[in-house]
A protein has these predicted regions:
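Active-site loop-to-helix "anion-binding N-cap" substructures in soluble metabolic enzymes
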Residues: 1-430
């Protein structure tokens, strides 16, 4: 049974900084059981950029992040059996995990034994020989065909995944499963969900931090809680807006293609170029616009849309009020008046969640909206949470990442969580 040695509202320090554990949570953590002397299967996400010419690691960010969890389990005298993936079949960076293990070993300054096997005789023998505090890293789980093929969450259960050969072979040799792979938690693969049928499934520190920050930001962070939603993945962002508003987020600030969707939904003709982009690039765009209309009606005054925009007029920035639309030029950024209004809202917010840029920020002519809004978020005195993927990359490129309370490790996983979707790996931990 879980021990009650550690209170649920303990504070923790990770590679990404301090965080407080949720007082009310639906998952167990590494504190809830005595792990000393126990075999622990730890699933992490160290999928990294690889030089295709020599196989060298180009980025060790994820390895550093998960190293802290590996080290903590080793410090607890657990016998750590690490599972992870790298890329997928057919890709140039679909390689084994030997160099990942070597880099992690350097980071935590202790031996990590790489085993070029996943659940064959060699892997099982190494697991049988493991001692307290030792760490072994098994090979790329995606070398196993079932890890790739068994990916469907059927009939609200994980029977197919829990019956996978990898899971059935490794499970008898472990007492606990720790899932630290938040970035892959929207996937339903054996190594992520299968073990929970055989042993307690616990959240690792990276997973715990993600769930704590994202959960608080959406549902219980300091008020007023606002969300800045932009970028080109408009269908995702409109779904996120719906979930946020249902959870009590007070205001949504829109930019990018997301703003264009809401402008159309509010009855504004945004012009042929921007309309055609939505029709070609946004799947089921008519349904997305209908949902946006519904949200504007249901949550009157809570969704902020641009009052002015910047058009791309032959490569030059041209500002105009939305009343002057349609124009024959595409919308590439929010306008100055909108920018000032959004910044005032951000400055007074208790919690700010950001996902997606305000415009085509890759072009310096149209980067003003994104640069200024992201800068304002970085200066906020409230709780600041940034989605993964291109948003996290933009904050890093702008040198603002260190000023943000939490930047998510997951792109697709973060979007799924913020949209309120069922996430298989999280369901398996309940």
């Amino acid at each position: 049974p879980p021990s009650q040695v550690v209170a649920q509202n303990s504070s923790y320090v990770t590679v990404d900084g301090e965080f407080d554990s949720l007082e009310d949570r639906s998952f167990l953590t590494m504190d809830d059981y005595e792990l000393s002397g126990k075999n622990v299967i730890l699933r992490i996400d160290i999928n990294s950029s690889i030089n295709p010419e020599n196989g060298d690691l180009l980025d060790d960010t994820r390895i550093k992040r998960h190293s802290a969890t590996v080290k903590e389990l080793s410090d607890k005298n657990a016998r750590v059996i690490v599972l992870a993936h790298q890329s997928r079949p057919g890709k140039l960076d679909f390689v084994n995990l030997e160099k990942h293990g070597k880099r992690m070993s350097e980071i935590i300054e202790r031996e990590i034994k790489f085993v070029d096997d996943i659940y064959g005789e060699k892997a099982i023998q190494e697991i049988k020989n493991i001692k307290d505090g030792q760490i072994i890293l098994l090979d790329n789980v995606r070398f196993d065909k079932e890890e790739i093929n068994l990916k469907t969450f059927e009939n609200d259960n994980f029977k197919a995944q829990s019956n996978a050969k990898m899971v059935k072979t490794l499970a008898p040799h472990a007492s606990y499963f720790v899932n630290d792979a938040f970035a892959a938690s929207h996937r339903c693969q054996p190594s992520l969900v299968g073990f929970s049928d055989y042993m307690p499934a616990l959240a690792g520190r990276v997973m715990q931090r993600e769930l704590d920050f994202l959960g608080k930001a959406i549902s219980s962070g300091p008020t007023p809680r606002i969300a800045v939603l932009g970028g080109s993945k408009a269908a995702d962002s409109v779904s996120i807006a719906e979930n946020f508003l249902e959870k009590g987020v007070e205001q949504i600030l829109t930019g990018g293609v997301v703003a264009n969707i809401f402008l159309i939904a509010s009855g504004i003709d945004i012009g042929k170029p921007s309309t055609e982009f939505i029709e070609k690039q946004i799947p089921d765009h008519e349904k997305v616009i209908e949902l946006a209309k519904k949200l504007l009606s249901k949550y009157d005054g809570k969704i902020e849309i641009p009052s002015d925009v910047a058009l791309n007029k032959d490569g030059k920035r041209y500002g105009t009020n939305v009343e002057n639309l349609p124009e024959k030029y595409p919308l590439f950024d929010i306008g100055v008046d909108t920018l000032v209004r959004y910044i005032q809202i951000i400055e007074n917010a208790g919690t700010v969640i950001a996902n997606g840029p305000m415009g085509v920020f890759e072009d310096s002519e149209f980067a003003t909206g994104t640069n200024e809004i992201f800068s304002a978020i970085s200066k906020s005195k409230g709780m600041t949470v940034v989605g993964g993927g291109e948003t996290a990359m933009a904050f890093n490129q702008m040198g603002l990442a260190d000023r943000i309370k939490h930047i998510s490790t997951g792109g697709g996983a973060c979007i799924s969580f913020m949209s309120g979707e069922t996430m298989p790996a999280l369901e398996a931990m309940r």
